[in-house]
């Protein structure tokens, strides 16, 4: 992603954006057997060999004492994206905040200098990493779903503690 120098941000800002809201878009891609552009011509989009995949899912952001970070998320077992993630080495998660069109008419100096142009204002964070799939670990799944739910429920005054209820599912 191209970032103009005057819009580069600090680590703390990126951390805050990736935490609130926690919804991110998980992207993965692999080389197609048909060549670099083979994915464009494939008609079977359910095939995990299709080439590209994106899933919109909430994440839990974990920060360790040594300054390293980890994103944790849950995909349904039958989601074809899981198969692709098991076969790729890298993935990308994109978090976005609010965005808005910026009119040059909003700048008072525009009438004098005519040096303002329309633009689009937004905030986004790209997080690159290596996917790790965890299967058949009920304790991990319960803990992950509880942590994700607690992360959101604590924002509500009447937030619920769902940890005890999750085991029924």
From Swiss-Prot:
GO CC field: mitochondrion
Tree of life domain: Eukaryota
Residue runs in coiled coils: none
Entries under Pfam families matching the protein: FMN_bind_2
The protein's name in its UniProt record: Uncharacterized protein YKL070W
